[in-house]
Amino acid sequence: KTMTQKNLALVTGANGHLGNNVVRLLIDKGVRASVRTIKNKEPFAGLNCDVVQADITDKQSLINALQGVDVFYAVGAAFKLWAKDPKKEIYDVNLEGIKNTIEAAVEAGVRRIVYVSSIAATEFTKLPIKESNGYNTDRRDMYFNAKNDGEKLAFELAQKHNIELVAVLPSAMIGSEAFAPLNVSYSVINLILKKQIPVETGITLNWIDVKDVAEGCYLAATKGRNGERYILANETCMPIKDTTRIAQELYPELAIK
């Protein structure tokens, strides 16, 4: 089928939790979904969109997927929280992926990129957390470092190549539609359910509905100011204790203690 090029969007990581919800939101607006491997069709069942193969580690595959695209939702990332060699498997892969992402968008003539960063890329020792606080100064964690430096690199390259870029920084996303493998938020929930994280810990999490984040991505594309970063999060955080209590009420069959 032909799509009007004018409003064609590409969503990378389109089988992931956020990517798939962005695709669903854009389905009436002209969208192409890209995934690293096309084997699993389940996330796209009944959806009227082109599904193409692209990998952030392969720039040419991105250039091909971006032909005729106006807005590029860069959702796909090679994210793990844990790795044998975090510098190589988490940090290097993602920074290389960001370089490929921006350069491919420039070569393909994309107008605007919505870059999905993370709340982990903010300075959260100063409360309340605001975009203007700057970046996280704690350098102990490769996941945080990759998110911080990745977002900075995205803005630097966008400026250098004169392409519009808006960053969104979601907190811990939950909600449907979700397909396996599940994201980091769900891994945390799973660890709690399996009693591998003690519920009495003082850890608080900032939950947000993935559909609200998808909507925030769309607003960043249509109304966001070029060069800005926008936090997409809840106004309040919730202790794990309260999260568990709500889960007990909603899903008594899980027998969460």
Which positions does each model-derived feature cover?
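N-terminal Rossmann NAD(P)H-binding glycine-rich loop of SDR-like oxidoreductase domains
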Residues: 7-29
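NAD(P)H-binding glycine-rich loop region in Rossmannoid oxidoreductase-like domains
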Residues: 38-96
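Conserved Rossmann-fold NAD(P)-dependent oxidoreductase catalytic core, especially the SDR/UDP-sugar
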Residues: 74, 78, 84-143
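Conserved beta-loop-beta element that borders a ligand/cofactor-binding pocket
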Residues: 117, 150-176
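A conserved pocket-lining segment of Rossmann-fold NAD(P)-dependent short-chain dehydrogenase/reductase
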Residues: 136-137, 180, 187-208, 212
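Active-site helix of classical SDR
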Residues: 146
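Glycine/proline-rich active-site loop of Rossmann-fold NAD(P)-dependent oxidoreductases
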Residues: 160-164, 175-188, 220-230
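Mid/C-terminal beta-alpha module of Rossmann-like enzyme folds, strongest
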Residues: 204, 214-257
